[in-house]
UniProtKB/Swiss-Prot annotation:
Segment forming the signal sequence: 1-17
Lineage: Eukaryota, Fungi, Dikarya, Ascomycota, Taphrinomycotina
Domain of life: Eukaryota
One Pfam assignment: DUF2430
Entry keyword set: Glycoprotein, Signal
Organism of this sequence: Schizosaccharomyces pombe (strain 972 / ATCC 24843) (Fission yeast)
One GO location term (cellular component): cytoplasm
InterPro entries given in the database record: UPF0321
Protein name as it appears in the record: UPF0321 protein PJ695.01c
Glycosylated residue positions: 39, 65, 71, 104
Sequence similarity: Belongs to the UPF0321 family.
Length: 117
């Protein structure tokens, strides 16, 4: 019985350790980015990130590669977020009202917070 309890505790510890690592990674992002990545859904309400690996990939892209904002940046990040490469996804464009929106409307959170330097 003690052995079973010990195994259960190890299993829970392993699961919680993985969750903690994910939260540590998210803690490095500005809160609106982290919230967007964690809660992004498509128009049918399906989560865009099916695994933590894809979320971490999007996180790493945001942190390490967004130094110059252009259409390629939008297209690549859209590919990470939706799994499809498209030039009709304008995540970082500040004038997105003039362009088609193919991604979740909550993506506009990025527009006001991103300060490229």
């Amino acid at each position: 019985m003690l052995l079973l309890l010990y195994i259960c505790c190890l299993f829970l510890k392993f699961i919680l350790a993985n969750v903690d690592l994910t939260f540590v990674e998210y803690a490095k992002l500005p809160s609106k980015y982290a919230e967007l990545l964690a809660n992004a859904t498509n128009q049918q309400g399906v989560m865009l990130f099916s695994t933590g690996d894809i979320r971490i990939g999007a996180y790493n892209y945001l942190v390490n590669n967004v130094t110059e904002i252009n259409n390629d940046t939008d297209a690549y990040l859209c590919q990470l977020l939706t799994g499809q490469y498209t030039t009709d996804c304008y995540i970082f464009d500040t004038n997105s009202d003039d362009k088609p929106e193919t991604f979740n409307s909550s993506i506009h959170l990025l527009n006001s917070d991103l300060d490229p330097k």
